[in-house]
């Protein structure tokens, strides 16, 4: 058959198909067009039925799992993969990971108080009265931020308030200042965020980042105190500088310092930077760092406690020069009472840090860098050289 005949036969078949299809349409047979009309009618019937029918309550697998006091990894896998988290008594807030292989609920005596459940990938908040959130994944960071803004942290105990407050603070910072995804910009951009500057992926070059790292290493032993730290310290030691010492609460200093520390750490791990995949050799190196995490955090907190002690003693000595020896002894005793809770908070922080921020099955990028940043935030380096007390306020030395 020649090419012309082939083309003619092909056109003939095509025209025949068109005629058959037209005949079906005219006769309202089962064509796609006719089926769409039937589907519309069926959808209307289904809608009417759904509006007049009360749905039967159902018990989902996620409901059964979440009602347990402890969850296993297999339970968690079932929960995540079923994604069946829409029940009225299950509300979820996205969070960070916990390194333990057993997920434990924090149980409260009051049934109306929300219950926090830490998992490998999320923080589940379970409440009996109203919905405050939903499942937050990598694609729903904005939902996480909105959800956290609805959480009434006053319903929680002090430790949980600290964690949620830090999460809200970190999410707000991440929302306002988008952290770039470029891996080479981690150091510079985190530093700029801490200093209050806007950061963008296009504004920082690799050369600038390398120079910043070199400058930081050279100045590691003699870091300056930023205005942000000074402002926080002024807020922390305000009760000490007040004449009415009876108004001082023993936990204020510990709460403030831990919030500063945990908030900035949470900021880093809330960013996309902490979620990037790493090569196996890098992962192994990070896991080795995780083994040293608890000791490093405790060392940082111990050093911070000592420096805050010196800071408070210095402020007390300068501010209360006219006090008698007996009054000074009473003051020092009160200062010690203020600092003791800080040590207790440090122990809690270590536990929370390892549980929330140190997953056993996922990599954490630049954990050593984060600890260095935390050291900057919490500790007061260069206290004797560039931090001075003037008129009851701490200021940078102008010299």
From Swiss-Prot:
Polar residues bias spans: 197-206
Disordered, as annotated region: 197-224
Start-end of Acidic residues biased regions: 207-224
Protein's name in the database: Uncharacterized protein S8
Organism: Diadromus pulchellus idnoreovirus 1 (DpIRV-1)
């Amino acid at each position: 058959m020649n090419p012309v005949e082939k083309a003619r036969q092909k056109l003939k078949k095509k025209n025949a198909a068109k005629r058959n299809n037209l005949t079906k349409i005219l006769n309202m047979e089962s064509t796609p067009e006719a089926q769409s009309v039937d589907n519309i009618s069926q959808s209307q019937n289904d809608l009417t039925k759904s509006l007049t029918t009360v749905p039967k309550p159902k018990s989902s697998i996620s409901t059964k799992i979440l009602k347990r006091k402890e969850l296993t990894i297999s339970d968690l896998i079932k929960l995540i993969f079923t994604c069946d988290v829409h029940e009225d008594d299950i509300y979820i807030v996205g969070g960070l990971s916990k390194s333990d292989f057993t997920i434990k609920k924090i149980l409260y005596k009051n049934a109306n108080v929300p219950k926090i459940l830490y998992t490998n990938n999320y923080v589940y908040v379970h409440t009996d009265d109203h919905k405050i959130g939903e499942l937050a994944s990598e694609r729903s960071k904005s939902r996480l931020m909105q959800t956290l803004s609805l959480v009434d942290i006053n319903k929680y105990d002090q430790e949980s308030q600290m964690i949620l407050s830090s999460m809200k603070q970190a999410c707000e910072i991440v929302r306002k200042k988008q952290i770039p995804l470029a891996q080479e910009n981690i150091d510079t951009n985190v530093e700029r965020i801490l200093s209050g500057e806007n950061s963008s992926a296009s504004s920082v070059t690799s050369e600038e980042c390398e120079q910043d790292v070199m400058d930081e290493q050279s100045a590691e032993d003699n870091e300056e105190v930023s205005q942000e730290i000074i402002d926080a310290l002024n807020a922390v030691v305000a009760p000490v500088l007040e004449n009415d010492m009876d108004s001082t609460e023993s936990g204020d200093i510990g709460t403030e310092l831990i919030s500063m520390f945990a908030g900035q750490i949470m900021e880093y791990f809330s960013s996309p930077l902490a979620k990037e995949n790493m090569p196996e050799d890098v992962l192994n190196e990070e896991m080795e760092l995780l083994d040293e995490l608890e000791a490093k955090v405790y060392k940082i907190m111990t050093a911070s406690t000592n420096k805050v002690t010196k800071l408070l003693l210095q402020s007390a000595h300068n501010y209360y020069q006219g006090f008698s020896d007996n009054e000074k002894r009473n003051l020092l005793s009160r200062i010690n009472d203020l600092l003791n809770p800080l040590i207790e908070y440090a122990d809690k922080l270590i536990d929370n840090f390892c549980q929330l921020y140190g997953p056993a099955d996922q990599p954490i990028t630049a954990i050593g860098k984060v600890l260095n940043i935390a050291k900057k935030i919490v500790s007061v380096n260069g206290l004797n050289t560039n931090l001075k007390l003037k008129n009851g306020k701490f200021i940078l030395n102008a010299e």
